Amino acid sequence: MTLTRIFYCGLLLVILSGCVVQSSQLSALTGLFKSPPVDLSANSWSVRYADYEAIVYAVTVPEGTLFSNKAGDQILFDGWSIRQVKGMGRRGLGYHNTDNSNQRTFMRGNRKIAIHSCMAWQQQEQSSMKRFSQQCGDREPYVNSILVAKDGSIALIHQVVDDRYTAMTLTKLN
């Protein structure tokens, strides 16, 4: 009986040894699913909002350009205006705005928090760059601006994004 038991245990060990996944096999298998690291430095921007500063990365989405980072900051820019702001070092911060004719409506959630009058965008040449500016205001006047480089890429966005007239500045780093 012990001889039979030894035989079956030996047979079981031989069968199981064929099922061992070696580390090189596992590494090759996991290597198939890993994507190579992506260098985002070409799409990096600095964002400043009140006393908060961070680095964000630009990604093209159907609605425009989304600037975001691992901290949860999100800024949606439609090509002319910053439309949504989330995060910015503040838990629960979330603004969005819409334009209708010459009015910009600022919202927090579903609640309307301010309506500002905004003029049409004006273009000016400024040392080999184009500066687009927009006069806006309600109780106080302010200017939104976009600076465009010679190659047509946006270099700087400066816009008021909330009812407290807090400006956000996005600056291209590379």
Say what each PLM segment does.
Residues 20-76, 81-174:
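Acidic, serine/threonine-rich low-complexity disordered tracts
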Residues 1-8:
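Bacterial N-terminal signal peptides that target proteins for export
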Residues 15-18:
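C-terminal motif of bacterial Sec signal peptides marking the signal peptidase cleavage site
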